[in-house]
Structure formats: structure tokens, C-alpha cells
Amino acid sequence: MRKLFFALLLLASGMTAGAQRNIQLHYDFGRNIYSDEEANRHKVELTLEQLNPDKWGCWFYFVDIDLSSHFVESAYTQIFREFNLAEHSPFAFHVEYNGGLNRNTSFQQAALAGFAYNGHSADFTKTWAVQLMYKHFFKSYQYTHSFASAELSVFWALNFAHRKCTFSGITELWRDEKPNGHGCLAILAEPQFWYNFTNHFSIGSEWEFSNNFIHNTNPESTQTFFWNPTLAVKWNF
């Protein structure tokens, strides 16, 4: 599971000068749905997110931590910095790092650079961002190699029912490579729905649709696209 819920973004407005932090705990049903293909998929994930707006733009990071009954199985992070191109401009220069470790090896690291367009409605109940970036994957472990890519990311957040409900999410498209070196289109979409009991506590669900970040454990399966829903709680600090 990979999240960049910058879509919860107050970034679009510079609405607050303070840091925005949340912690999410997800129970993942993917292994129940694909018992053969995702036999090793972890059921519990902890996500930490923080957004720090400032007068130049913002910092953002998240860390996804997969947990089992015995180990911290993996940790994956994305960290980015945006620099506003002008005061009150919706356009920003964007630089980013992706990478992480698991119990046996590592995720292939990548660096990204490009531009972002950030927007919001007058009352900030609707926010969105579009990012178009050059992406470079590095040789990170055995059988990987460096290669050039590009990524398009779209984020959104919609608050309604007097801000009791939030529908937010991300869709990302990028060029990946198959083991034989042939290029392919990688797709990741992660819509989330939250019911906000208070300003701090929410219960909701995330639905992950992806042909990437999946380790198919059934060599005879032809399944390439997966739907992995979760049940989750979130605390906003």
C-alpha cells in the first residue's frame, strides 16, 4: 500500500502556517480477497503523515509501516519539497524522494522533479493538486538497474455534510519496467472515505487499485490488477 494523501492538503491554500500531522491504522483485506496471489500480503499497516507549509511552499512526508505479529515487515516513505513560483501562485516547483526497506531487501529508490498545480474552492471544502514530474529510478538491489521515467499524479479532497465526511484520494500513473526490461504503465489509485466524529478522530476506508506494489505469490496466476480495501481509523493532531 502506498499513500500520498497530500490530498488532505491544506497545502493548496497556505491555509495555516502550522504543521498538519495524522496517524492512520489500516486493516487490509487484500489477502482475504486474493488468498493465492497475495498470500504474503500484510494485514496491518501504520501510516504517519506530516505537512509543513511555510512562506516558500511546503514540506511533506509519509511513512507506511507494514506490521506482522512478530516483526516490522517494511517501511516505505515519500518525502517532497515544493517551492511556490510566485506569491499566491497556484504553480510550484516540486522535488521528491521515494524509497524504503523491508525485512529481506529494499524498495527501488527514485528521485523526482517537476511542477505542481494546486487549487481549492473559496471555502476550502474542495482541494486538488496535479503534479507532472521526471522520475529517475536508481539501481537499488540485485537485478535492478537505473532507468528514466515520468509520473503524473492527481490528488483531491472533498469535505461535505458540514465537514463530517471527507472523500479524498490519489491517482498516479508512471512508466515502470518489467523484469525483461520492457516498459509498462504502472497505475495506482487510492480513494479514501472518512467519517469525522471530531476534528481529531475519524473512521473510514481506503480502496487501493493497482498493478504495482504487488508481489504475486502464485506463479500460475494471470492476475495483474488488484483491489485491496481496508478498514481504518485516523487521528489528526
Residue ranges and their predicted role:
Residues L25-F29, Y61-I65, V95-Y97, V130-H136, ...:
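Transmembrane beta-barrel strands of outer-membrane/channel proteins
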Residues A19-S68:
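Short glycine/proline- and aromatic-enriched beta-strand/turn motifs that initiate or cap beta-hairpins
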Residues N52-D54, F83-L85, Y117-S121, W156-F160, ...:
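Residue-level signature of outer-membrane beta-barrel architecture
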Residues R21, W56-F60, A86-F93, S121-W128, ...:
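Repeated loop/turn-to-beta-strand initiation elements of outer-membrane beta-barrel proteins
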Residues K3-S13:
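Sec-dependent N-terminal signal peptides
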Residues F225-F237:
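Outer-membrane beta-barrel "beta-signal"
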Residues K135-S202, E208-N216, W235-F237:
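Outer-membrane beta-barrel transmembrane domain signature
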Residues N22-Y27, D36-H42, H70-F155, N218-N228:
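Outer-membrane pore/translocation modules
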